[in-house]
Amino acid sequence: MQAGRLLLRKAWSALLTIGFVLVLNFFLFRVLPGDPARAGIKDPRMTRAAQAAIHARFGLDKPVLNCLASLNPLRRGPCLVSPLQTQFFIYINNLLHGELGISFHTKIPVGELLRARLWNTAVLLSAGQTLAIVLGVAGGVLAAWQAHTRIDYAALIISLVAWSLPTFWLGLILLFWGSRYAGLPIGGQLTPGLAAAGTWAQFTDAARHLVLPTLTQTIIYLAEYLLIMRSTMLDVLAEDYILTAKAKGLSTFQVLKDHALRNAALPIITIVALNLGFTVAGAVQIEAVFSWPGLGQAIFESVARRDYPVLQGAFLLLAVSVIVANLLADLLYSWLDPRVQAAL
């Protein structure tokens, strides 16, 4: 019963947040300066007729809301259209049908453009975050268990140095090392002119291209997870029930696995969920350094081109991903710590 109440409460809160994000996502990219038509074409000789035609093609000739100005600077007169013909209603209606608009630059649907990019970013983030979580948690547990020893001090120093490194700088260093000493590809996702898709050669080539960007992300986030896990594990190991478990004659592995790790892992779950948005933001730098064709690189290119539909679609995907990740983290948190459900 309590679990059901918690699920409904968290799901309702997530839906309200997504609704707010949808409204913010609509207005945020319509108050930005400049004319999207000129930004997409970049032709100073564009006539007013051509500019109006582009506005009509992308729906920018309609009012944002009823009786509010549209993005079309050529429109004059009062706003006498139906609310169903406004940009906001069309935007919501398109979202309900899975449409994110048309790119100003490539003239293809934003959903189609972001789908492939999102998959590439998901592969990169999954590989990097999985390694960072596993190694960071294991390193934090080891450092806490060996507190105030050479192992602990070495883990602290290395983690603090790694955590303070700028993402792009670390990427450039690994790029130089990987290309010169390890023979790894310096950028891209696949070697041009490779065999047909689905072959073993293509899989191994893609894996080699993934090594350096994954390693960059792993080093940055491994340090954070190790430091947090060490701190929380030290607090847990000082609890009375840990001393009782040791007094019962349980092995070190049993004490850590059955009594300490579950409670010490709670802050890590929250940090991983919150890091999702920051991870994608960091992926912009990583994908730019290694020319990885992911969502971060699409955002970087769209900012330079002022391709607002792509930015709007990417912002929406990132926001919804973070909200869903936090919802899952809250539910997992309540499962690991029954006190959360008891507090309802």
PLM features: residue spans?
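An internal, D/E-rich "acidic patch" concept
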Residues: 64-137
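Helix-terminus/capping and membrane-interface signal
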Residues: 13-26, 30, 120, 124, ...
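Hydrophobic alpha-helical segments of integral membrane proteins
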Residues: 3, 7, 11, 50, ...
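Membrane-water interface segments at the C-terminal ends of transmembrane alpha-helices
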Residues: 24-31, 90, 94, 157-188, ...
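Residue-level signal for discrete positions within transmembrane alpha-helices
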Residues: 14, 117, 121, 129, ...
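Alpha-helical transmembrane segments of integral membrane proteins
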Residues: 2-6, 118-151, 167, 183-344
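Residue-level recognition of pore/gate-forming positions within transmembrane alpha-helices
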Residues: 14, 44-45, 133, 160, ...
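Hydrophobic alpha-helical transmembrane segments of membrane transport/permease proteins
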Residues: 18-85, 178-203
